[in-house]
Amino acid sequence: LKILIASDAWLPQINGVVRTYQTLGNKLTSQGHEVRYITPDKFITIPLIIYPEIKLAINHWFKIGVIIEKFKPDFIHVATEGPIGLAVRNYCSKNNYAFTTSYCTKFPEYINTMAKIPVSFTYKILKWFHKNSSAVMVSSNSIIDELNSHGIKRTVKWSRGVDIKAFNPKNKIDLNLEKPIYLYVGRISKEKSLEDFLKLNLKGTKLLVGDGPSKKKLEKKYTDAVFVG
């Protein structure tokens, strides 16, 4: 099968969306499918003012249709609600092409944190964005319930797997850190509200595993915590 994936989030960004679709593409390719990505690196981009790490495509509108018609995919999936995702969504809707979408980030809450835009307003936009999708793929039952409560239907649970070759139980390693250890594993970025955790006066050691745009700043500010990358 020929599968087209459109995503506004891509390398060199470090986040769950990029990792998810990299892994998915590699797995599909290993099974004999042909996977093509429409991502920001194929276009002229500008940095998002409130989050410079995120690059937004600006010259993609007239190229999207050419890419789709040339590739002739059997399936089209829109991973994000950004400029590229919007362009692919609109092209598919206009030309009666079936497509699926994903809801990977709590976008309304994220935008509210970064730019103070009301959550209710963003949910209305998301409802419009996903209304023509054949299926809206989400990671958990709680997110399904949340989206359904805002009128976003045709939600399907798509859980994330774990590469058991890369991640598997090993013998305990003595980190020589004061006990107890409070562990965070994930992206190091503003929307994770990690400062609420790092400010806590706790006996023991705060240990953070992961990377992201806020790592250097937080590592410098909270010297009592251990950042292992």
Please tell me what each predicted stretch does.
Residues Y123-K170:
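Donor nucleotide-sugar binding/catalytic pocket of nucleotide-sugar-dependent glycosyltransferases
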Residues A98-T100, E109-W128, V138, I164:
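Nucleotide-sugar donor phosphate/pyrophosphate-binding loop at the beta->alpha transition
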Residues I3, F75, C92-Y110, M137:
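Active-site proximal beta-strand in glycosyltransferases
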Residues K215-G229:
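Nucleotide-activated donor-binding/catalytic signature segment of Leloir-type glycosyltransferases, i.e.
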Residues N176-L207:
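Conserved donor-binding/catalytic core segment of Leloir-type glycosyltransferases
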Residues I64-G85, K94-T100:
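Short N-terminal targeting/anchoring amphipathic segment
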Residues L1-F43, F71:
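N-terminal subdomain of nucleotide-sugar transferases
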Residues L1, P169-I181:
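Nucleotide-sugar donor-binding and catalytic loop/hinge architecture
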